[in-house]
Amino acid sequence: MAENQNNLIWIDLEMTGLDPERDRIIEIATLVTDANLNILAEGPVLAVHQSAEQLGLMDEWNVRTHTGSGLVERVKTSPFNDRDAELQTIEFLKQWVPAGVSPICGNSVGQDRRFLFRYMPELEAYFHYRYVDVSTLKELARRWKPEILAGFKKQNTHQALDDIRESVAELAYYREHFIQS
């Protein structure tokens, strides 16, 4: 392991819904790549315990998706609360990237950041204020070069580690097929 200011921190959260005032984080995963998108390390993948009452607030899509993946059961039996998951994630990141230098990287990470700000503020503050949001490139490709979208198929497992691995691969695809140097 080698701390490097050019390494990138990738994150994905699974939540009980989309509203950070009402909904909660139920899974967190991170990984670190070098500047060329080579995966250097995968961080802890943690189900975050939430009460039965909180889980009962999920809409039909979230119940179906997170029950089908086994995440709801993992959340019910998880020993980790928000703070535990936050601290374990930060300890992992400290080995690879200094605080305050990596943008937050992933797909639709603005949404993830809203939840981090609310429930894991120390982790949110670990990131630089900038974003590397793969969904931005997808939206631009859809408008400017839609023919390339068919070349990358997402699995959409809605499991945090699978989703971030896929985000890294998707950015590498856009780098090769959309971004011209």
UniProtKB/Swiss-Prot annotation:
InterPro entries: Exonuclease_RNaseT/DNA_pol3 (IPR013520), Oligoribonuclease (IPR022894), RNaseH-like_sf (IPR012337), RNaseH_sf (IPR036397). It is found in: Cytoplasm. It is an enzyme of class 3 (hydrolase). Keywords: Cytoplasm, Exonuclease, Hydrolase, Nuclease. GO terms for molecular function: 3'-5'-RNA exonuclease activity; nucleic acid binding. One of its GO terms (cellular component) is cytoplasm. It comes from the Bacteria. Its EC number is 3.1.15.-. The active site is at 129. GO terms for biological process: DNA metabolic process. Pfam families: RNase_T. Residues 8-171 form the Exonuclease domain. Its main location: cytoplasm. 3'-to-5' exoribonuclease specific for small oligoribonucleotides. NCBIfam families: PRK05359.1. PANTHER family: OLIGORIBONUCLEASE, MITOCHONDRIAL. Belongs to the oligoribonuclease family. This is Oligoribonuclease. It comes from Yersinia pseudotuberculosis serotype O:1b (strain IP 31758).
